[in-house]
Amino acid sequence: MFSKILVPVDGSENSFRALEHAIFLSTKIKEAQITVLYIIEDLPSLYIYSPKIMEKLRADYEREYTRILERCKEMANKSGTNINTVLKEGDPASKIIGYSDMERFDLIIMGSRGMGKFKEMIIGSVSNKVIHHAKSSVMLVR
């Protein structure tokens, strides 16, 4: 069955709904372990950025991921569920697929989209890449 569940989150409501589904599923499958994964997208490393600007960007990312992961922990605590949190840096789709494959997750539960439609058309959605390239089963949540 599904004993290892990976839930990538990006702060979108869809990603929090995915976590709600994972928490619900874990109440039905007593041995299920949930890991919440947040990915910091690569910081642009253009030569025009000063070290001060890069530090500010990094601090902004840190505040954001801390806020998001704290919300995930609160959601889990309300239902009496334990979760693990993991932070990675890089391309979201590649990191989700790579981490899932490396840790042998049985199921990835993720939001169907986290960014605007226009941006998805240009670069392709993370969820679409994960569906087509992950070895694990994938459940998309709207």
Question: For each of these PLM feature ranges, what is it?
Answer:
Residues 3-52:
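Small/aliphatic-rich secondary-structure junction motif
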Residues 4, 98-142:
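Gly/Ser-rich helix-loop-strand patches that form or flank binding pockets
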Residues 23, 66, 70-77:
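Class I S-adenosyl-L-methionine
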Residues 35, 84, 139:
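Conserved beta-strand positions in the Rossmann-like core of class I SAM-dependent methyltransferases
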Residues 52, 87-91, 113:
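Short beta->alpha linker loops
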Residues 54-67:
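A short acidic, glycine-rich active-site loop
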